[in-house]
Amino acid sequence: MVDKSQETTHFGFQTVAKEQKADMVAHVFHSVASKYDVMNDLMSFGIHRLWKRFTIDCSGVRRGQTVLDLAGGTGDLTAKFSRLVGETGKVVLADINESMLKMGREKLRNIGVIGNVEYVQANAEALPFPDNTFDCITISFGLRNVTDKDKALRSMYRVLKPGGRLLVLEFSKPIIEPLSKAYDAYSFHVLPRIGSLVANDADSYRYLAESIRMHPDQDTLKAMMQDAGFESVDYYNLTAGVVALHRGYKF
């Protein structure tokens, strides 16, 4: 019998007990929640908005559908999906982190996004929804923080309706070698400094850089989605592979 307490995983470059990672990730996002949107704009030079727009365009979401914005944070995707599904549809903004969920709720209500949005604190590995609930699931810059990614992908598959699709927007592996080296230098030297100056938290942004490097590359994540049951899985490299959008279907 396997001793669960001895199972390990990665927290950035650290090896930690699996049971500890969720709390460590929670601490990171409790710390950065209030500066999350500002830091996203600064870190990506605003390009994250284009990546998210492309995700929306690839989602195929239309009026009357039900969408799960998983690890939805401050609600960038939820705001757009809310308009697409209209009054007859529904968007569930789910996040494991209470601070991020609170920021998302406040932000969306302040811009008038109400009525067809629900907020749920949920763990991606054990989603609290019935089978075959959602037409579309998105997880944007969240999967790399999940302890058991395979379990989370199976959970997402379960709650998708037949014909539904999952879109995973996540940092990935640059496909141009000179860019990869420059990206490493930026991630490990510049990002922590920005985090220190703006959010007074260099360590959380050092974890961000490390977690990106430990995340599966494009083809590995594609295979993981297929192993979870998804079909017709493909991916798009964005900004030369700095970010990738994976899409898979449940048939």
Curated annotation (Swiss-Prot):
Molecular-function GO terms, alphabetical: 2-methoxy-6-polyprenyl-1,4-benzoquinol methyltransferase activity; demethylmenaquinone methyltransferase activity
Pfam families linked: Ubie_methyltran
Protein origin, superkingdom: Bacteria
Reactions that this protein is recorded to catalyse: a 2-demethylmenaquinol + S-adenosyl-L-methionine = a menaquinol + S-adenosyl-L-homocysteine + H(+); a 2-methoxy-6-(all-trans-polyprenyl)benzene-1,4-diol + S-adenosyl-L-methionine = a 5-methoxy-2-methyl-3-(all-trans-polyprenyl)benzene-1,4-diol + S-adenosyl-L-homocysteine + H(+)
Binding site for S-adenosyl-L-methionine: T74, D95, N123, A124, S140
Compartment(s): Cytoplasm
Name of the top EC class for this enzyme: transferase
Primary location recorded for the protein, binned into one broad class: cytoplasm
Pathway this chain belongs to: Quinol/quinone metabolism; menaquinone biosynthesis; menaquinol from 1,4-dihydroxy-2-naphthoate: step 2/2; Cofactor biosynthesis; ubiquinone biosynthesis
The protein's Enzyme Commission number: 2.1.1.163, 2.1.1.201
UniProt xrefs under CDD domains: AdoMet_MTases (cd02440)
Keywords, ordered alphabetically: Cytoplasm, Menaquinone biosynthesis, Methyltransferase, S-adenosyl-L-methionine, Transferase, Ubiquinone biosynthesis
Any GO CC annotation of this UniProt entry: cytoplasm
SUPFAM superfamilies, per database record: S-adenosyl-L-methionine-dependent methyltransferases (SSF53335)
Any one of the GO BP annotations: menaquinone biosynthetic process
Known function: Methyltransferase required for the conversion of demethylmenaquinol (DMKH2) to menaquinol (MKH2) and the conversion of 2-polyprenyl-6-methoxy-1,4-benzoquinol (DDMQH2) to 2-polyprenyl-3-methyl-6-methoxy-1,4-benzoquinol (DMQH2). In vitro, can use demethylphylloquinol, an intermediate in the biosynthesis of phylloquinone (vitamin K1) in plants and cyanobacteria.
Family from the record: Belongs to the class I-like SAM-binding methyltransferase superfamily. MenG/UbiE family.
Record text on subunit structure and interactions: Component of the Ubi complex metabolon, which regroups five ubiquinone biosynthesis proteins (UbiE, UbiF, UbiG, UbiH and UbiI) and two accessory factors (UbiK and the lipid-binding protein UbiJ).
Listed HAMAP family: MenG_UbiE_methyltr
Name of the featured protein: Ubiquinone/menaquinone biosynthesis C-methyltransferase UbiE
Species this chain originates from: Escherichia coli (strain K12)
Gene coding for it: ubiE
